[in-house]
Amino acid sequence: MIADVARLMARKGSARSLSLLLLAALLATPPAVRAEAAPGQAATQAASSANLTGYWVLRVPHDDGTFRSSYFQLEQSGDAVTGALLNNSSANGTPVSGTLVGKHLHLTTAAASSPAGAAGTAAGAPRPSIVIEVTLEDGKLSLQTTYRQRTTAGVAERTTREATLPPPMIPLPALHDVADNNLVRTPPMGWNSWNKFAGRITDADVRAMADAMVSSGMAKAGYVYINVDDTWELDRDANGNITTNKKFPDMKALADYVHSKGLKFGLYSSPGPTTCAGYMASYGHEAQDAKTFASWGVDYLKYDLCSARTIYPSTPENLQAIYQKMGDALQQTGRPIVYSLCEYGQGDVWKWGAKTGGNLWRTTGDISDHWASMDRIGFSQVDISPYIRAGHWNDPDMLEIGNGGMTADEYRTHMSLWSMLAAPLIAGNDLRTMTDETKSILMNAEVIAVDQDPAAKPVEMVAHEGTTEVLMRPMADGSVVIGLYNRGSEAAPVGFQWKQIPSAQAKHGTVRDLWKHEDVKISGNGYSTTVPTHGVVLLRVASAK
């Protein structure tokens, strides 16, 4: 049975190249392989005697000067062909099957159920198949791949089994507690490139976002980090130092520019051999890369698990050790660098993330710009809210506000919920083209104040009836923030009784609507109002004087 794996060349929801499409994250055990290709085999085979059994590699050049290599394995029995797309997101590949007719092979993957937290899909929802049309040409395979209605093409050549394997396992360090770096005592606020730009991000784009962060008023509202996500990397030089690709000719100069705007600069890497998009990562070079990041002026590191999953089993102990290694390295640089753990909530990271030196940790799979994704992720966070404390935050992923996939009411719910959760507020839209409505949501000072409250107290569930929920969070000044949420598809009444709010039931002061920016008159034993579809009413109840 084939259980070997190779480098992952896919990134969440991105299908702009064949390498990304081939290795879309549909995880299953690959079929058995009857025979392995001999190393270097490249003989031309006639259609009548073609034998596709073996390992294949697709190398796709990109404008940034990098190549992404995607691997797959095939087994041929007569005209029937089975195999697997190999990736580094798990110890298994994605099964494919098809029939060879002359020189043409039609391969498909079976539609698979999405795991909980998968971007844009509900747990158990079917993911679309990958369709690969293959033509034999002089011992090579010309591929045309379609996934999520996107089609692209490339040529694959034979390779060896060894080429598909991850590098040898480096022993992990013994566990210990990394000292607190005393950073981000309230949740970090900023911007990240991935949600809007993904692999297209360039030096010029980042400079433009820094400019817009200031000119739009975002910086004044508290957003300070400008974070470059994946696809800036190239390779390593003769001394093992990580280098940047053509899109980022001088990373230190870019960081200096961001700093000149009064902002802070963030970067991305992975503990595996490659990042989620298939670029050079920090495996075996943690201390060296941390020093490089510090020398460039990096203030924030997002560290994405990605290909490390194929080297180390994802036990809580292994995950903690993986992230501890970079946590130690960052602190040894002497530069204050916010440490963002991104391992999708595996191993109950909220229980040990702070021990690695982490300041924030992703608690779920990737978010997407759709109500179902945001709703599922956001409302799943209440139970783990007690794990937050100053400098250490649950991270339900970046904000999608302004990207166009949700209504204004849904975006207000997004902002309200993340703020009640004391989640990092990392915008993911194009800051240059924000509408007034988007600005009013992202820069609502009264809502931001909820997120940034210094008490760092957890949110609590007050009431849950059908598709409506009432959440409550105490503030440092003695006030209480109450969120009335309607998760249903129709407008609905949502309310609470004062007796459900222990800190406010005896008597209370002014009640303020944080979205309407006006006081609300409440009399009697409680409050109820009609909340629009997927909407929210966010109230701040002052303590009585």
Where do the language-model regions lie?
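Central antiparallel beta-sheet cores of small beta-barrel/beta-sandwich binding domains
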Residues: G40-D138, Q144-A153
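Structural recognition of the beta-strand scaffold that forms the well-ordered cores
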Residues: P187-S193, G222-V228, K264-S269, D299-D304, ...
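Bacterial N-terminal signal peptides
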Residues: S17-T29
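N-terminal secretory signal peptides that target proteins for export/translocation
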Residues: M1-S14
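Carbohydrate-binding surface patches
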Residues: W418-L421, I426-G428, H464-S503, H534
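C-terminal beta-strand-rich structural cap/linker in extracellular carbohydrate-active enzymes
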Residues: I522-K545
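Aromatic-lined carbohydrate-binding/catalytic grooves of carbohydrate-active enzymes
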Residues: N195, D205, M209-P313
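Glycan-recognition surfaces
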Residues: Q288, Q331, R335-D430, D451
